[in-house]
């Protein structure tokens, strides 16, 4: 059997995923479900994109309770549950996303970066495999990743034979 969640699972992104699904399934008849889930999803997308703001957690909690109480059907009444549950048990992940601009699981691309350590031998393998030419450096010298060009695909890390690329 395989685990559905582990330390590489971002709970904020998981809540966003489930809320996106329930929003898509909403019939749209009641405002709480139709508009409320849309607003919650916008906040979660902002947080996972590294644009979370002070007050987002409280706003998510407030919207979640109003949606639960005001929705007319089971879907709307349960739609906020993944957000409420992850806030209850993994609140620190939300706080890390918002205040530290960090995804502990390393899965929210906007909140991660790849860096080349001093273990780099200058073999150029990472640069050759980078699809956007974000890595530069001379043969046998430490290479550098241009963060403004990096698309965070991880190919550099996968191809480095020296373990010289870190995901932060």
PLM feature segments, named:
Residues 1-4, 165-167:
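Generic detector of short, aliphatic-rich beta-strand segments that form the cores of beta-sheets
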Residues 31-38, 116, 125-144, 155-168:
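Iron-sulfur cluster-binding cysteine motifs and their immediate structural context
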